[in-house]
């Protein structure tokens, strides 16, 4: 009588080698999750920030001030900031009359915003096409929390005008002299800005007085 042959598949243990891989696996499919690449690390910022743009081409003489300001994008990490910054026009590329803002999330760059209402702004000026570096260093100082009174800061705006460009840092409480003077001095040092700069209170600016004076100067 012929010897009966065992046709059952051999187990992995019976042959001392691993079982064959599933033939149904698609080409390129990762079966071992331990080998999958980790998502790139991100570096969260202390605050989220929003870019805003005020397009002069959408303004009309009858429109209320600030009605043409629109939010562009909010970022919360270092990586998101650079992704945005590297893909937007820098001040030297903006058209005359444009205003580009970077404010803490949920603070609108308007005098009427409750957080801005009692504040003011420090302003520097430079020639046309000269503000790109100042603007970048201002942004990095703000989002990187380099100011001793960083909680007092609402945001910053760069304004492109016919003969010059202006950058301003907006703050919350104009009456807090120690905080405002500290911010002004640190800002000048960070930018290595040699000229004097002045602090204007928003309530004073609303009066449109040609004889408007700085509340503080550094």
From Swiss-Prot:
PROSITE patterns: IF4E. Residues 21-30 have a biased composition (Acidic residues). According to the redox status, the Cys-116-Cys-154 disulfide bridge may have a role in regulating protein function by affecting its ability to bind capped mRNA. One of its GO terms (cellular component) is cytoplasm. PANTHER family: EUKARYOTIC TRANSLATION INITIATION FACTOR 4E RELATED (PTHR11960), EUKARYOTIC TRANSLATION INITIATION FACTOR 4E1-RELATED (PTHR11960:SF8). Component of the protein complex eIF4F, which is involved in the recognition of the mRNA cap, ATP-dependent unwinding of 5'-terminal secondary structure and recruitment of mRNA to the ribosome. Recognizes and binds the 7-methylguanosine-containing mRNA cap during an early step in the initiation of protein synthesis and facilitates ribosome binding by inducing the unwinding of the mRNAs secondary structures. This is Eukaryotic translation initiation factor 4E-1. It comes from Zea mays.
